[in-house]
A protein has these predicted regions:
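N-terminal flexible/basic segments that precede or flank functional cores
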Residues: 1-23, 27, 75-81, 87-107
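DNA major-groove recognition helix of helix-turn-helix/homeodomain DNA-binding modules
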Residues: 4, 44, 63-78
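Residue-level signal for the short linker/turn that defines the boundary of a DNA-recognition helix
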Residues: 20-23, 33-34, 60-63
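Residues within the helices of the helix-turn-helix
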Residues: 26-27, 37, 48, 66
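The alpha-helix within a helix-turn-helix
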Residues: 29, 40, 69
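Residue-level detection of the helix-turn-helix DNA-binding "recognition helix"
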Residues: 30, 44, 55-57, 84
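Short alpha-helical DNA-recognition segment
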Residues: 32-52
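Short, solvent-exposed alpha-helical "recognition" segments
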Residues: 57-62, 88-90
């Protein structure tokens, strides 16, 4: 039996503050030991934009967040949620959102 405490997203946010797309991308890039150039190429973002996103100077639209998530093969809902929550915080609103994919309707 392990006595190690397991942390969920809520626990991490309490300890480290609100998560962001930029913080997520920076952590991912550093864990993969990729340069800004190589990582930017992988996710379809220029070096300048990636730098601005990582430093919190630029946000990411939900659409772009979904594209990035697909390139990284992570659940798109994760980055889309972070993107929407960042937009809300930038507007001075304190909300948490739950994002779930819905089936596309036939045309």
């Amino acid at each position: 039996m392990s006595t190690e405490k397991k942390y969920g997203l809520k626990d991490l946010e309490r300890r480290l503050g609100k998560q962001s797309v930029g913080a997520f991308l920076r952590s991912w890039r550093l864990s993969e030991e990729l340069s800004l150039k190589d990582f930017g190429k992988k996710i379809g973002v220029s070096v300048a934009n990636l730098c601005d996103i990582e430093k919190g100077r630029k946000g990411v639209s939900p659409e772009k967040a979904e594209q990035i998530a697909k390139a990284l093969r992570v659940p798109p809902a994760l980055l889309v949620r972070l993107s929407i929550e960042e937009s809300l915080r930038a507007a001075g609103l304190s909300y948490s959102v739950d994002v779930k994919p819905v089936a596309k309707r036939a045309a």
